[in-house]
Amino acid sequence: MAKHTLYLVTYDRGVYSTTGKTKPYHWLFFIQVNFGGEKNQGIVHQLRGMPGGFYYRGPEDLDLNKSGTLKEQLEVGEVDDSRLSRVHDILKDVRIETNESSTWNCQNWTLDGFEKLKAEGFAYDYLTAEAIKHWLREGQ
């Protein structure tokens, strides 16, 4: 049975034009299914939208090498071929904040999802949400 590496990936979203401060990075899950040459293809699970209108669309195909402002790629676990759909089943049930004035974002969703994936053995036991936040923080 083939195993695929599970990553947390961040994207740089630039800076706020009014303050010059770095915007929070966009975080997502990436399951690498084909790597070699110029390809880094896989399945993405990410939160989309804006505060008050966030949604999870489900698995999306993506080649990370062609995906824009990639910042970091942190290996967090493995997924067997036969369990790829279980990742979606877990992530579709992760709570999404609907309060428009909240500071909650894709990073919160990803960390909540990480804990659920870890509980089912997809993510490495030694990783913690605090360590991930530190490694993937803005402004490094």
Predicted regions mapped to residue ranges:
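N-terminal accessory segments that precede or flank the first globular/catalytic domain
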Residues: 1-48
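Surface-exposed beta-strand edges and their flanking turn/coil or helix-capping segments
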Residues: 21-23, 56-61, 88-91
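Cysteine protease-like catalytic core of ubiquitin/ubiquitin-like
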Residues: 33-78
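Active-site nucleophile-His-acid catalytic modules used for acyl/amide transfer and hydrolysis
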Residues: 64-140
